[in-house]
Structures are given as structure tokens and as C-alpha cells.
Amino acid sequence: MSHSAVSQAGAVSVSIENQRSLRRSVFKQNNSISFNSKSWSSSLALNQKTTSIRDGKRYPSTTICMSVQQTSSSKVTVSPIELEDPKDPPLNLYKPKESYTAKIVSVERVVGPKAPGETCHIVIDHDGNLPYWEGQSYGVIPPGENPKKPGAPHNVRLYSIASTRYGDFFDGKTASLCVRRAVYYDPETGKEDPSKNGVCSNFLCDSKPGDKIQITGPSGKVMLLPESDPNATHIMIATGTGVAPYRGYLRRMFMENVPNKTFSGLAWLFLGVANTDSLLYDEEFTKYLKDHPDNFRFDKALSREEKNKKGGKMYVQDKIEEYSDEIFKLLDNGAHIYFCGLKGMMPGIQDTLKRVAEERGESWDLKLSQLRKNKQWHVEVY
């Protein structure tokens, strides 16, 4: 599928600073399209039904057009604004026995060739029937039979949603997932054993536009973004695909123009990955640094490229220790701290925080208890 520039009466010229960043952030459909100095019509409707051709086959798809005026400001207009109306988050609208059938819009590999493994950004069309809030998760039921329960479907796999409630196309009809393909290699032979590969992650990464997908949810309240205080500080810590909910947070803070939702606090992201090629959504985050230097900080831990102060591999907990004085002061002043990623990251982080607390003459157990009591501590690991 391609997105063609059009010339009509009333069209305006749009100069795009970063083609690749815009393509990944908004259009997601075609990796070869050029956006420089194109003219875009302000009157094209959303969701024009078309077909896309992939591997010689036709797939139904949707042309998405972004409103022209959005490019003249630093933020994007979103709709429908009614998504802001509910006072409580949507929960479990669809359950495993009565799941929702959505469609795949696009699947894009979002890591470089030197990254260990493959991670995909997957856009799903739910047609506005599966509303969610930032920080929630969808459940995915892969096709096929559960090998442990003959005749029964596969178990639900949960994935953090990597977009705001308005989706990657800002129209409230899509949601995005960030999925690492789970591949098993035999420790003795070093060869891949497809029978032990992750069923759901491989299904998602192999999906094509137009493929159907069974969704449950949305679920989760622990990682919901508190928005009652626009001046709040949010410290976000992630490894790998754990960055997914933070992409939604940051888009809401810095990319989208939502009425009465102006963020003037501090968002501080710590991301741990193997190497530069493994960085996820790096162009988006780097743009926020440029556009909002007073409200966004971004620190990376590249375990295969950097060394910590002891000469070992640089992990995210080493970055936390490096900035521990600032982090503890921010927590003392009410900052929220979030953790998302592999559960194996938490022991090292907890040990670091405990050691730093003791060096400061504080009890970490007491401090952690207080953070939980004040609802400043948010953890979602898998």
C-alpha cells in the first residue's frame, strides 16, 4: 500500500524534517515513500479502503491521511476527543471465550541487523471497539490448538500497548504492540528448534496486513499514567520491549494535542538494551529531547557496547546508580517510578536501590513501603 501525495485546491505544502521518523510514527505502511515537501489535501477522509500487495498477494488495507494543520505545529490533533470522557479505564471488554476479532494493519521490524533477535512494531485495527488507556495491555490468542489441552485454544498472551488511546494514526481505531520474536536454540547444538519457539510472538511477527487476530482486554491498572498533576515527575525504567507503555506515555505528553492535557513536568526514561541496533523508537525519543529539553531526559544502557564504572557490562541498574542522588531526591518529592520488561531485571535494580539507600543512611524496605503506599511505585514485568 502506498500513500500518495495529492494536489487539490486548498492543499498546502508540508516540509517534513525527518522522513523515516514520520513514516514510523504516522504512516507505518510503506518504507519507500518520500515525504519531503509534498502537498497534502486537508479534506481526504480517514479510513479509505484499499488493497496492498505483498508477496504477490492482495490484502485489504486502509489509507490513513493526517490532517494538514498538524504539520504546522509541534503536536498532532487527535480524535475522537470523546475518548477523554470516561472517568475510569476500560477493563476486560473482551474475554478469552468471547474475544474480539481485529485486523493486522502493518508489521515492521524495528531493530537493526546487529541486534540479537528480532523485534517488530505491529499496528492492529480494532475499529474503535477496543478502547484502552495508556499503560494497559491487550491479550492475544494465537491461532491453533493448545498442545497441552487438545481441542482447546492457546492460552492468552499479554502484551503492553505501545500507543496512546488514539493509536498510531491518531483516530482512535488502532493500537500498537512491540513484540520480540521468541526463538529457541538448542544449547548443545546451537540450532533453532521451531517446536519450542514462542507461538504467539512468531504468529504476530509473521502476520500480514489484513490477517485476523483475536484480542482480549484491555487489562491492567498498575501502569496507568497518572495525569491529575501535569507537573509530576515520571521516571520510566525499561529493558527491551518493556519500553512499549512508555512510548504511549511520551506520545501523550509530547506528540499529541489533547485539550486540557498539557504536560509541564519531567519524564525521564532509562532504557537498557544490548547495543545501538537494539534501541527501540530511538528517533521518536531523540526528537522529544530536541523539542522538549526541559521536560524530557533519556539515558541508555548498552550492555554490549558500554562498560560500567567497575569495568563490567553496562546494565540499566548501573545507569540508575549513576543518577541515584537525583532519583532519590525526585522520589522524595513525589515522583512516580515505573519498571517494565523482563522480570530478571528487577533483582539487580532492587539490589542497587537498596545499596544506594543504605549509603544514604536510609532503610530501603521502609522507603519502598512508603512508595507503594503513596502509589508512586509501578511494576509490570514478565
Curated annotation (Swiss-Prot):
Binding site for NADP(+): 235-253
Location of this chain's protein in the cell: Plastid, Chloroplast
Lineage: superkingdom: Eukaryota
One GO CC annotation: chloroplast
Known EC number: 1.18.1.2
Gene3D superfamilies (alphabetical): Nucleotide-binding domain of ferredoxin-NADP reductase (FNR) module, Translation factors
Transit peptide location: 1-64
Protein's job: Maintains the supply of reduced ferredoxin under non-photosynthetic conditions.
The name this protein goes by in its record: Ferredoxin--NADP reductase, root isozyme 2, chloroplastic
Source organism of this protein record: Arabidopsis thaliana
Species lineage: Eukaryota, Viridiplantae, Streptophyta, Embryophyta, Tracheophyta
